[in-house]
């Protein structure tokens, strides 16, 4: 465990290791979180102590499971992937709340559902599709 407020920093818990740089006591740049076997489970990007840009979380085989985009510590976009790397979920955020387009996919890559969020709540017409692409149902919010 490091106690410095500048430079390289490492911290270990029972299950995970955290490693990155500190600047004035705040995380800065790329931080890697690894499990006990040394496998990277997450890679986070910090600027001035806040999450900034793309952070990624990984399946045990190294494939990206989740990608979250941050601006000044707030989520702006969220993508989740199936274990083969196929896109599963896409969400837009504003000020840390779901806001904007939302899309969900079958493991085949075909669109499962789509709609919009406004200030964290579903709004408008949401469409859900069969794997063939035909509309299965519509819900209004």
Per-region residue spans from a language model:
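Glycine/tyrosine- and acidic-biased, solvent-exposed loop/turn segments at the edges of beta-strands
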Residues: 1-141
